[in-house]
Amino acid sequence: QYSASIDDFARIMKAGNNGGYANTWLIADSRKNEIGRLELGLKNITLERTTDGYFVGSNFPINEKLIREETDFNPQDLGQSSVARHTRWEQLMAENKGKIDVAAAQRFLGDHYDVVEKKNDPDERTLDGHVDLSARGYPNWQPPYGTAGAVQNKVANAAMIAKMSFVAAAGHACGQNFKATEHLDAHPDMSWQKSLQRDMDAHPWTMFTASK
């Protein structure tokens, strides 16, 4: 939004970078039909780009040198949510090569396939994350049945980006509602959250466009 190119985006992101969040940042330049992947560590920074491929991300970098030198992350641990989700993204990209559009992206964000269990089972390892349904929780982040997951979704194609538009859905993309009272009744150990928890209903995909 504030950059003139992928290189300009990388410049903005690198300025004042303290390395506090080693991660993958995805960017698209609709004018050049080009996409990029910026991996931003403190000392290890990489920028890749393509005009006929794809990049995916799931809250961690994939550059081996960056992972090795600046994190304690284990990219081989499929049980970790980030690794499982990255694996699922790669599967979906391969299965849908040449067929990815807005509708497909919306389906992907509502995906419930767990690559560890090899079946549909919404939990912390699925793209449409449902930590609240997982007895494992999200280690180092959320306790078993913790109230967390993927509850905001946004999709845009090149034509929409050129018009500063996108479609978004609040709540789970799968359409499942989260009801606070039901969750607290099922997990009384979380009763201390009663004053904080709110329902999170799933809302339909809606188009948003910047005003002229």
Which functions belong to the PLM regions below?
Residues 1-212:
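C-terminus-biased signal that marks the final domain/tail of proteins
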